[in-house]
């Protein structure tokens, strides 16, 4: 189902940028968005949202043409920069002194950020990391089609940094007709492993696609997480049934809306199914435990182009002596060891070793070593 949708391709490294004088400096979020727009990760988007699409996405979770899209992908600039720009111009997109692309300006507009916060994040509380970032970024949005004119050279995980066209090819090569995507920003603990393997029972392959773009400061660093995924896959997963590749986007922490966004993006990478667990892409207590699953009832599988797989919170049951969920285990809470990425992070930062019911010992070793290194460099 998923590979039917056509991928946008806005990469052109021969594009002449020398004649273009004006430039917009991209922050890290806009830079990662530029790449994903150009390589088709954000298909059907061809650029940063214009006003009519932006308004439509914020209000209805759809583009102006009715296609499902739940997160506004925007290019914010300061009022000073906006005053120098005109609709119809072509402007360079730069970061760290390098020109990475161009935007053909179709729209310059001032968004209602409070409305965006309320509708996208369901809160205007600046303690929410997504809202905080929204308010910190400049106040004018520039919309228009983009071209990526230079690929990033400093990808921290080059062998795992694949474009959607490459992951699709990889799945095809492996003969996978059905592929389930799993999004994570945490090391994989036993609850994740249980969910992934349950899903793997009904599809041909698992696409483990950890997010390595900008996350909040107390999330475990991407390089440590990547090493933990490698050691886990090496020791506990069948090599011919799992594929690991990074998702270079920034984390929005938009809960339900981000769950839809993550599913649509994984469709572009070639997945037919997508795992949605408890509090997907949530943070703190801003969203209900299963709100990110309930939002999918607003859309048909046909219009999403990917099938969501919903999983309840899983735990280790000391009576069952196995991983389980309330769907499969009759025992009370007193017999359940509740696992979460937050809990694992907490234990590790306090110098405690999570028990084997929490995380595989090989993974724990990697995390302890990684966090010690982090403390030293701080």
Swiss-Prot record:
It catalyses: sulfate + ATP + H(+) = adenosine 5'-phosphosulfate + diphosphate. Keywords: ATP-binding, Nucleotide-binding, Nucleotidyltransferase, Transferase. It comes from Bacillus thuringiensis subsp. konkukian (strain 97-27). Pathway: Sulfur metabolism; hydrogen sulfide biosynthesis; sulfite from sulfate: step 1/3. One of its GO terms (molecular function) is ATP binding. It is an enzyme of class 2 (transferase). This is Sulfate adenylyltransferase. Belongs to the sulfate adenylyltransferase family. SUPFAM superfamilies: Nucleotidylyl transferase (SSF52374), PUA domain-like (SSF88697). Its EC number is 2.7.7.4. The keyword Iron does not apply. The keyword Aminoacyl-tRNA synthetase does not apply. HAMAP family: Sulf_adenylyltr (MF_00066). GO terms for biological process: hydrogen sulfide biosynthetic process; sulfate assimilation.
